[in-house]
């Protein structure tokens, strides 16, 4: 038990610092991408990855702030100041961690669209930015309840809730919080990632796969040289050194699709990339689960948490919760694959539509 407590205290201070360092590295890399092309940054996974990185950094800083707050002598500090620190810290932790969970779901949505609707994926424009704005606003509005519930409890010398809220029906808000910001996005992520997995992953060699499956694998990673079009006709060139010619032909009367594809890259590598992203996503869910179970348990029967076995397991659950941020940072640091794609010639076709993208490789 003492060992677990010591390990927990070490993680409280080391994980936030390490996580902020990793996220700073990720943000610097993404900023370089954004400077080269804002459109490329906003219409690929760059924007949600950056949003997740910022959210995780704020969460880690808030966790570190709370850890320092609890070991710092309070002296004659007014209770109203201590309560304000508690409110602000808990609000930041809840809001940014909930936002991060939905960002994971957002990445799963992008994977799903890339696999099952590759043409739509190539024509994404303002949707990611607008979705993240709405998500941030909705999460912030919901988590306002923490500013009302949380206070500094003199008896325990720690942050907690007012008794009037903890002992009333208001405690059900915690269950709603868990349901909206863990259960729902987690189930949706599992569903979408499972569909992508069964469509894109095969234990057999690439030669044995049908061409459509292989091409859908390629849709996961954005090219380094392409053009994206806005609804107003604006274009953005992602690589000024490459000569890009985009030819779009639409034949409404074609019943048999005409497909011509020349690929650059390794399909197995792209499949492994998808698998890695999904596995890290599942690991993140598992690391979150014990903490949410204890939180839901405490909402209904806090006295049972005094059991010796439960008191032993709770630090482990907390350590798993802190570990998720290292998991997030690892994902962010290793999965910015859309910023490093290689040029490719692609034709995307459906039953009555033929779209051709031709890329000159003179300087590739």
Swiss-Prot record:
Could you list the residue ranges that cross the membrane? 2-22, 49-69, 90-110, 131-151, 178-198, 278-298, 316-336
Q: Which UniProt keywords apply?
A: Cell membrane, G-protein coupled receptor, Membrane, Receptor, Transducer, Transmembrane, Transmembrane helix
Per the record, ranges on the Extracellular side are: 1, 70-89, 152-177, 299-315
The record, for Pfam families, names: 7tm_1 (PF00001)
| One term under GO cellular component | plasma membrane
Q: Which residues lie on this side of the membrane: Cytoplasmic?
A: 23-48, 111-130, 199-277, 337-364
Question: Is Repeat a UniProt keyword of this protein?
Answer: no
Q: Where in the cell is it found?
A: Cell membrane
Question: An example of a Gene Ontology BP annotation on this entry?
Answer: neuropeptide signaling pathway
What InterPro entries does the database record attribute to this sequence? GPCR_Rhodpsn, GPCR_Rhodpsn_7TM, Neuropeptide-GPCR
How is the protein disposed in the membrane?
A: Multi-pass membrane protein
- UniProt keyword annotation of Transmembrane helix present: yes
Q: Name one GO molecular function term.
A: G protein-coupled peptide receptor activity
Biological role: Not known. Putative receptor.
- Give the family per the record: Belongs to the G-protein coupled receptor 1 family.
This protein's name: Probable G-protein coupled receptor AH9.4
Which organism is this entry from? Caenorhabditis elegans
């Amino acid at each position: 038990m003492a060992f677990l407590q010591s390990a927990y205290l070490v993680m409280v201070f080391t994980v936030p610092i390490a996580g902020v360092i990793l996220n700073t590295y990720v943000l610097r890399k993404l900023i370089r991408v954004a400077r080269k092309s804002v459109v490329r940054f906003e219409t690929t996974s760059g924007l949600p990855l950056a949003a997740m990185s910022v959210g995780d950094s704020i969460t880690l800083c808030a966790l570190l702030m709370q850890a320092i707050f609890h070991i710092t002598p309070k002296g004659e500090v007014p209770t109203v100041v201590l309560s304000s620190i508690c409110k602000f810290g808990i609000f930041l932790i809840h809001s940014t961690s909930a936002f991060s969970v939905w960002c994971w779901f957002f990445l799963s949505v992008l994977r799903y669209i890339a696999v099952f609707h590759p043409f739509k994926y190539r024509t994404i424009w303002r949707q990611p930015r607008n979705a993240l704005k709405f998500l941030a606003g909705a999460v912030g509005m919901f988590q306002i309840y923490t500013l009302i519930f949380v206070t500094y409890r003199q008896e325990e010398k720690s942050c907690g809730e007012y008794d009037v809220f903890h002992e009333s029906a208001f405690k059900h808000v915690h269950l709603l919080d868990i349901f909206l910001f863990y259960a729902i996005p987690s189930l949706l992520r599992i569903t979408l990632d499972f569909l992508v997995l069964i469509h894109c992953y095969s234990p057999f060699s690439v030669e044995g796969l049908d061409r459509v499956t292989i091409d859908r694998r390629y849709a996961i990673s954005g090219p380094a040289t392409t053009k994206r079009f806005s609804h107003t006709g604006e274009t953005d060139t992602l690589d000024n050194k490459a000569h890009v010619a985009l030819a779009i032909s639409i034949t409404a009367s074609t019943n048999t699709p005409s497909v011509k594809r020349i690929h650059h890259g390794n399909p197995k590598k792209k499949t492994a990339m998808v698998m890695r992203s999904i596995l890290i996503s599942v690991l993140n869910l598992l690391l979150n689960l014990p903490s949410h179970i204890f939180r839901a348990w405490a909402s209904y029967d806090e006295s049972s948490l005094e059991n010796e076995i439960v008191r032993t397991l709770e630090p482990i659950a907390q350590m798993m919760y802190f570990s998720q941020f290292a998991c997030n940072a690892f994902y962010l640091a290793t999965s910015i694959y859309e910023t490093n794609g290689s040029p490719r010639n692609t034709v995307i076709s459906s039953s009555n539509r033929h779209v051709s993208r031709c890329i000159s490789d003179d300087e590739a």
